Each structure stands twice: as structure tokens, then as C-alpha cells.
UniProtKB/Swiss-Prot annotation:
Gene name for this UniProt entry: ftsB
Name assigned to this protein: Cell division protein FtsB
Localization in the cell: Cell inner membrane
InterPro entries tied to this protein: Cell_div_FtsB (IPR023081), FtsL/DivIC (IPR007060)
Species of provenance: Escherichia fergusonii (strain ATCC 35469 / DSM 13698 / CCUG 18766 / IAM 14443 / JCM 21226 / LMG 7866 / NBRC 102419 / NCTC 12128 / CDC 0568-73)
Origin: domain of life: Bacteria
Classification lineage: Bacteria, Pseudomonadati, Pseudomonadota, Gammaproteobacteria, Enterobacterales
Pfam families tied to this protein: DivIC
Length: 103
């Protein structure tokens, strides 16, 4: 019985080593799970960005309002007959704002 017990103990030790440290063991499993979680988080961010871009494309294809708003905000364009006014804060307010931002 001593040899059989020793053999079974050796097999148990080998199986435990394979489970914890071997290829496709617990360490590899946890690393892959972490990689999967990180990839799923990245995919969720990219999906949200794609959804936002698709909504913007639909707005631009669907109507003139979105196109007009974008032209006004990003390119400072105006319609014929309109006057563009830019409001610039006075120098004392700009100095106060700059002083607060430097703190």
C-alpha cells in the first residue's frame, strides 16, 4: 500500500502543479478574464462613440437645421442679411479670470 499511496500523492502533486502553474492554469485563466473585461470596457466606449457619430450623421443627412447649426458654431457663418456680433469681455474681467485660472 505504501507504493500506491506514494504514486497517488505524486499524481496529486503533479495535477495541482498543472492546475496552478501549468499552461491554461488558474493564472492564465485570471489573466484572460482581466483581458476580456478590459476589452469589453473598450468596446463599450467605442460603441457609445459610434452611436453618437451615427446620430450625428442622421442629423446631418436629415435636415438643414443641424447643418446650419454646425456652420454657424464652427465656421462662424451667417445668413445673407444677418450681422455677426462677437461679445468680448472687458479687460478687467479678463484679468480677473486669468488671475483665478493661474491659482
Amino acid at each position: 500500500m505504501g507504493k500506491l499511496t506514494l504514486l497517488l500523492l505524486a499524481i496529486l502533486v503533479w495535477l495541482q502543479y498543472s492546475l496552478w502553474f501549468g499552461k491554461n492554469g488558474i493564472h492564465d485563466y485570471s489573466r484572460v478574464n482581466d483581458d476580456v473585461a478590459a476589452q469589453q470596457a473598450t468596446n463599450a466606449k467605442l460603441k457609445a462613440r459610434n452611436d453618437q457619430l451615427f446620430a450625428e450623421i442622421d442629423d446631418l443627412n436629415g435636415g438643414q437645421e443641424a447643418l446650419e447649426e454646425r456652420a454657424r458654431n464652427e465656421l462662424s457663418m451667417t445668413k445673407p442679411g444677418e450681422t455677426f456680433y462677437r461679445l468680448v469681455p472687458d479687460a478687467s474681467k479678463r484679468a480677473q479670470t486669468a488671475g483665478q485660472n493661474n491659482r
